[in-house]
Amino acid sequence: MTIRNQRFSLLKQPIYSTLNQHLIDYPTPSNLSYWWGFGSLAGICLVIQIVTGVFLAMHYTPHVDLAFNSVEHIMRDVEGGWLLRYMHANGASMFFIVVYLHIFRGLYYASYSSPREFVWCLGVVIFLLMIVTAFIGYVLPWGQMSFWGATVITSLASAIPVVGDTIVTWLWGGFSVDNATLNRFFSLHYLLPFILVGASLLHLAALHQYGSNNPLGVHSEMDKIAFYPYFYVKDLVGWVAFAIFFSIWIFFAPNVLGHPDNYIPANPMSTPPHIVPEWYFLPIYAILRSIPDKAGGVAAIALVFISLLALPFFKEMYVRSSSFRPIYQGIFWLLLADCLLLGWIGCQPVEAPFVTIGQISSVFFFLFFAITPILGRVGRGIPKYYTDETHRTGSFWP
């Protein structure tokens, strides 16, 4: 190839060379398992949500008198509208399933540890943005659960000292959840996914600065292979499995993950017997309800994200992977069971014994983050590969 041809080659252009560096020639540890495929699946879910959301917005009307009917118009009159709506509604659930698995994989293999602190913190920010985006999106159909869910959750801001009531009034655009609230939520719901894209790109760039973690929790620059074609094929298998799983929900059980009360138009004069959020909010909602005081519940929710953000800054552990840490491994599986229990408690009535079970489960949830630094020092004697300040070398802890 001549110098002139090299200059005008597509692969030599900055954007293509960047894509080639991060998606094709990206050096990847050779022992990655299928658990490392959820990052790309999360990206696919985000693209699905944006594409379907843009088309749904073309037919949606953000007005309290027309929102519910416009959703029904999409379902009944727009060609393929039912598919767009079911893909978008169930796509949110799939997105959270993938991200929850991604988070628990990171906890199991300690992917938050040095030098990937920034990667983990960006991931927590993305998770928080997802929660906000999904919540305001749940309000848009303007059904009973949409209206009352918005009323209950936004009212939590009143627990903030001094400025709480002002924030609630600003969120509502008035003195109750009404048309101004719906318009604000629609605007934010359209904007936030694009902010999520930017945060995801930063997350990917931060990850590729130091490379991916691996099941052994060791660091090595030698035992790496190109992402394409080796791990691209492994990811492709995961994409096909995800497409099948996603299709089952869309075509055979499109409303199972939703709430039947949301097929009733919003009525400010009639409160549902039991107000519950979408299933992916239930563990956090259970923690919120486990504390009778509103301010305490809001503080507990804030502590959930503070605990996640603080994980990378605990003292460095001797061994990263839970494969070599049986004590931590047992505690991790208890945490997973605890989160599932919190999810179940979140959809139960606020009465005994569910309140007590929720309080015990919430205590264990925070206890996990409290004892993680201690467990990180257990397991001395397991080999750890580290990076010397002057040169990369393999070594073991004595």
UniProtKB/Swiss-Prot annotation:
Positions bound to heme b b566: H102, H203
Family (UniProt): Belongs to the cytochrome b family.
Assembly, per entry: The main subunits of complex b-c1 are: cytochrome b, cytochrome c1 and the Rieske protein.
Regions crossing the membrane: 38-58, 82-104, 119-139, 185-205, 231-251, 295-315, 327-347, 354-373
Alphabetized InterPro entries for the sequence: Cyt_b/b6_C (IPR005798), Cyt_b/b6_C_sf (IPR036150), Cyt_b/b6_N (IPR005797), Cytb/b6-like_sf (IPR027387), Cytochrome_b (IPR030689), Cytochrome_b_C_euk/bac (IPR048260), Cytochrome_b_N_euk/bac (IPR048259), Di-haem_cyt_TM (IPR016174)
Bilayer topology term: Multi-pass membrane protein
Domain of life: Eukaryota
Cofactor note: Binds 2 heme b groups non-covalently.
Family annotation (PROSITE patterns): CYTB_CTER (PS51003), CYTB_NTER (PS51002)
Gene3D superfamilies in the cross-refs: Cytochrome Bc1 Complex, Chain C (1.20.810.10)
Example of a GO biological process term: respiratory electron transport chain
Keyword entries, A-Z: Electron transport, Heme, Iron, Membrane, Metal-binding, Mitochondrion, Mitochondrion inner membrane, Respiratory chain, Transmembrane, Transmembrane helix, Transport, Ubiquinone
Binding site for heme b b562: H88, H189
Record keyword Oxidoreductase present: no
Source organism of the structure: Triticum aestivum (Wheat)
SUPFAM superfamilies hit by this protein: a domain/subunit of cytochrome bc1 complex (Ubiquinol-cytochrome c reductase), Transmembrane di-heme cytochromes
Protein name: Cytochrome b
Requisite cofactors: heme b
Binding site for a ubiquinone: H208
Subcellular location: Mitochondrion inner membrane
Note: Heme 1 (or BL or b562) is low-potential and absorbs at about 562 nm, and heme 2 (or BH or b566) is high-potential and absorbs at about 566 nm.
Manganese found in the keyword field: no
Function: Component of the ubiquinol-cytochrome c reductase complex (complex III or cytochrome b-c1 complex) that is part of the mitochondrial respiratory chain. The b-c1 complex mediates electron transfer from ubiquinol to cytochrome c. Contributes to the generation of a proton gradient across the mitochondrial membrane that is then used for ATP synthesis.
